[in-house]
From Swiss-Prot:
TM stretches of this protein: 30-50, 72-92, 101-121, 152-172
Domain of life: Eukaryota
Protein name: CASP-like protein 2A2
InterPro entries referenced in this protein's UniProt entry, alphabetically: CASP/CASPL (IPR006459), CASP_dom (IPR006702)
Entry keyword Cytoplasm: no
Origin species: Populus trichocarpa
Lipid metabolism in keyword set: no
Membrane topology listed for this record: Multi-pass membrane protein
Subcellular location: Cell membrane
Quaternary context: Homodimer and heterodimers.
Family the UniProt entry places it in: Belongs to the Casparian strip membrane proteins (CASP) family.
Length: 230
């Protein structure tokens, strides 16, 4: 008789756990790096714009003279700080709770739109500075302040690169949040198809028939036998 090897299942379980831990560690490292890259991008865009000042025979022009560029500086500063803080939290090897998943999901979404708005309004100002708009008496300032417009363009392009990373972070945080919920359970009943909401357990099965129900069912099924004379 062949002896059953009882040592393999525990080893298989341990190997599966180690593999899951390796996968989680790799994903945690990848997300940490994904959050650190926007720090460098946002700081670069911020520094380039902060140093963006030009003075010539036509006068002096600084980023602080335009509200769109001031907003870009502030937005990049906020996003750099948030990215650094979130990277530190994500790098910690611990399980995520539902409140943490919701917090990162919402903050990633908000910061993505904040940095996207900064790049969008800066692009509009750069377009007007290059082309001008006679209807609002906006002259083509880049013809006289080419260096200023060049630095502003560099800062805006870097900001849009940061937007790409924030969009990826939004997808990651969305997956981490909604993967915590169970898939919807669909059951077939006599009244049709009934869909159970996310995360709720399936409906319990109907109770088995009692002895009384079985006895009545047997009597109804055999009326001739019940009416026969004794």
């Amino acid at each position: 008789m062949e002896k059953k090897d009882e040592g393999n299942p525990p080893m298989a379980v341990m190997g599966s756990r180690d593999e899951n831990e390796d996968v989680k560690s790799t994903m945690r490292t990848a997300e940490t790096m994904l959050r650190l890259v926007p720090v460098a991008l946002c700081v670069s865009a911020l520094v380039v714009m902060l140093k963006n000042t030009q003075t010539n025979d036509y006068g002096s022009l600084s980023y602080s003279d335009l509200g769109a560029f001031r907003y870009l500086v502030n937005a990049n500063g906020i996003c750099a700080g948030y990215s650094l803080l979130s990277a530190v939290i994500v790098a910690m090897p611990r399980a995520w709770t539902m409140p943490q998943a919701w917090t990162f999901f919402l903050l990633d979404q908000v910061l993505t739109y904040v940095i996207l708005a900064a790049g969008t309004v800066s692009t509009e100002v750069l377009y007007l500075a290059n082309k001008g708009d006679t209807s609002i008496a906006w002259s083509a300032a880049c013809a006289s302040f080419g260096g200023f417009c060049h630095k502003a363009l560099i800062s805006t392009v870097i900001t849009f690169v940061a937007v790409i990373f924030y969009a990826a972070l939004s997808l990651v945080s969305s997956y981490k949040l909604f993967s915590k919920y169970d898939a919807p359970v669909v059951t077939q009943s006599g009244e049709g198809i009934k869909t159970v909401t996310l995360g709720s357990p399936p409906p319990p099965p109907p109770p088995p028939p009692s002895n009384l129900h079985l006895h009545l069912h047997a009597k109804l099924a055999c009326p001739a036998h019940n009416n026969s004379p004794n």
